């Protein structure tokens, strides 16, 4: 794969950027501690069966190495082997899994996003990322309390958005998810959405 192809592929990922609002007040999941405690998935309002989650894809560096090296990296569970793109998609989308949000059992406050990796936002694109190597990059910064920001975006002065500025939707068939300031004007190729918390079993997830 040529350098130009690799550069084009990753520029597509970066250039892709739906405003998010969260409300836990009307959610009651059976068998959980309290009416608003436990684990939730976030469904897009008005788009039945579309959730906030992650899509995985094979990185360009993997495509340029031998099958033996790639297999060894896979068996070693190297996170960089399958980078994750935070996105919105349906339950039936291939290589997609919803993000599971967990609340504190004592306070019911959002405390974590179900991935074991620490999420952060790219300070250039604002994109939420989980890739293991990118958190050391110059253009990346950790977000303190990201789960709380996502659950209560208006209270924390942020907008969460997804956009299709070019042919990225054709290649990946999905937008990326980005964080913007509350007063930022979103690009005209962005579409505002709302998310609501739903119980995983009710959403079709075990």
Curated annotation (Swiss-Prot):
Signal peptide residues on this chain, from the entry's feature table: 1-19
Domain of life: Eukaryota
Induction conditions: In zinc-depleted conditions and has increased expression in NAP1 deletion mutants.
Keywords linked to the UniProt accession: Cytoplasm, Glycoprotein, Signal, Zinc
Post-translational note: N-glycosylated.
Keyword DNA-binding tagged: no
A Pfam family that the UniProt record links to this protein: Vel1p
Subcellular location(s) per record: Cytoplasm, Cytosol
A GO CC term assigned to this protein in UniProt: endoplasmic reticulum
Glycosylation sites: 26, 48, 91, 139, 152
Family affiliation: Belongs to the VEL1 family.
Name of the protein in question: Protein VEL1
Species in which this protein is naturally found: Saccharomyces cerevisiae (strain ATCC 204508 / S288c)
Gene: VEL1
């Amino acid at each position: 794969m040529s350098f130009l192809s690799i550069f084009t592929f990753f520029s597509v990922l970066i250039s892709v950027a739906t405003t998010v609002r969260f409300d836990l007040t009307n959610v009651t999941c059976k068998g959980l501690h309290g009416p608003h405690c436990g684990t939730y998935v976030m469904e897009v309002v008005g788009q039945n069966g579309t959730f906030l989650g992650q899509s995985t894809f094979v990185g360009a560096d993997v495509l340029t190495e031998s099958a033996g090296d790639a297999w060894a990296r896979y068996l070693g569970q190297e996170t960089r082997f399958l980078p994750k793109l935070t996105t919105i998609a349906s339950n039936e989308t291939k290589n997609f899994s919803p993000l599971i949000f967990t609340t504190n059992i004592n306070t019911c406050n959002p405390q974590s996003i179900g991935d074991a990796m620490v999420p952060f936002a790219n300070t250039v694109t604002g994109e939420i990322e989980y890739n293991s190597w990118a958190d050391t990059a110059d253009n990346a910064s950790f977000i303190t309390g990201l789960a709380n920001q996502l659950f209560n975006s208006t209270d924390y002065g942020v907008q969460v958005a997804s956009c299709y500025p070019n042919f990225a939707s054709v290649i990946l068939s999905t937008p990326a998810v980005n964080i913007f300031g509350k007063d930022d004007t979103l690009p005209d190729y962005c579409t505002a959405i709302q998310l609501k918390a739903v119980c995983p079993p009710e959403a079709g997830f075990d």
